[in-house]
Amino acid sequence: MDSCCNFSLGTKTVLAKDSFKNVENKFLGEKIKGSVLKPFSSDLSSKKFRNRKLRPGVAYAIATSKNAKEALKNQPSMFERRRADPKNVAAIILGGGDGAKLFPLTKRAATPAVPVGGCYRMIDIPMSNCINSCINKIFVLTQFNSASLNRHLARTYFGNGINFGDGFVEVLAATQTPGEAGKKWFQGTADAVRKFLWVFEDAKNRNIENIIILSGDHLYRMNYMDFVQHHVDSKADITLSCAPVDESRASEYGLVNIDRSGRVVHFSEKPTGIDLKSMQTDTTMHGLSHQEAAKSPYIASMGVYCFKTEALLKLLTWRYPSSNDFGSEIIPAAIKDHNVQGYIYRDYWEDIGTIKSFYEANIALVEEHPKFEFYDQNTPFYTSPRFLPPTKTEKCRIVNSVISHGCFLGECSIQRSIIGERSRLDYGVELQDTLMLGADSYQTESEIASLLAEGNVPIGIGRDTKIRKCIIDKNAKIGKNVVIMNKDDVKEADRPEEGFYIRSGITVVVEKATIKDGTVI
């Protein structure tokens, strides 16, 4: 009889000696190899096989080189790997924080609306990652200074050629409802999600099995479906995306300990001192080389989470209804009685939610071989189409810099800098290690001449101005013969009346500020 019986639960498999040699099969993702040297009949007569004790009443199956492929092919469906379906995944992007760490860039804009990389906004990072991962059900939660963020989302993702199929992008703004509890704004990341759990009761969202929760202030390129697949494979209730980090930055993040099975066994939010040392781990067991492990002995939570929808609903409404933050409250508590898994992400990832990290990540883009770049044909980053002309330059010296569209550059020098859209640099300007966020509109030649004649300062940078290690926010007006170099290496300073702040030694010229002719900072 040529056919082979199917293996069922309770069935024991007897492997005939040498029967799998020269045969390659896949069973539960593993490969079995060998070569047939003896006929099956000799195996049945072998002393070892005859002396094997078989339990009476239990069906045994014999897998040989002749029936192995068919037998393994006909396994029950419970042994097959379940593929995660992006149609059953929704993304929640958190964009409602007050942005205190990015102040003054967030003085008039939500953190996800802050420009990055010359022509993008921070929100474009998770949005583009979702689109490239085929996740087309996206919710954006907003609260503080959301006008520019809402405007950018509308211009970029609502009907501008980006096809969401049967998906959507919904902006969920913080609202107040009747009653004492309803008067409160979002109290944290978990509280923000809790207030909108009702959206998953809608008919169009009832098939959502997993929810990924994303931050709006990170710089990285990630296929979220690989992350969700790991979540499904490990049968996790919650999965944390994690990145190895060195000791100098470890205390800035929530740190985790992960056992060899991938389960998160301990979570500590931004530990210091002895608590920080206790979170040190051998990262070689998570795929790092000994050299990499010595450099990065900590595992940080990226603030990217995947929840089973059912688990998220229960945690936020029943188990921990008064907990407001995922990182410091929900996740540490859930580790005790839920399957919380860790997903090690080895590619570039940077939290750019502070002035220092934001500045350094942007300036790093101008390196000859940057660790991260926006240029990728297969996974592009999307942003609002501005329909701007190419940049015009006149006898400029430009070294290792990024120049966005629609700029006018006089006879100037630009080194290791990023110039945002519609920027204007006059003759003799020298920029070094500077991030210029650009302008929202142009001023005509006659308008500029009129302003200069009246002793006023037009948008852009005036003649013979020298700037180093600076962030220039949108629509700033910097006069001629200005020097911004922070020669005294001041680390922190607030000069709002003069139009600038200093954070971590980086000078930040605020949006629409006017720096008068001859000013020295």
Curated annotation (Swiss-Prot):
Pathway: Glycan biosynthesis; starch biosynthesis. Its main location: plastid. One of its GO terms (molecular function) is ATP binding. Keywords: Allosteric enzyme, ATP-binding, Chloroplast, Nucleotide-binding, Nucleotidyltransferase, Plastid, Starch biosynthesis, Transferase, Transit peptide. GO terms for cellular component: chloroplast. Activated by 3'phosphoglycerate, inhibited by orthophosphate. Allosteric regulation. Residues 1-61 form a transit peptide. GO terms for biological process: glycogen biosynthetic process; starch biosynthetic process. Its EC number is 2.7.7.27. It catalyses: alpha-D-glucose 1-phosphate + ATP + H(+) = ADP-alpha-D-glucose + diphosphate. It is found in: Plastid, Chloroplast. Heterotetramer. Belongs to the bacterial/plant glucose-1-phosphate adenylyltransferase family. This protein plays a role in synthesis of starch. It catalyzes the synthesis of the activated glycosyl donor, ADP-glucose from Glc-1-P and ATP. NCBIfam families: glgC, PRK02862.1. This is Glucose-1-phosphate adenylyltransferase large subunit 3, chloroplastic. It comes from Arabidopsis thaliana. The gene is APL3.
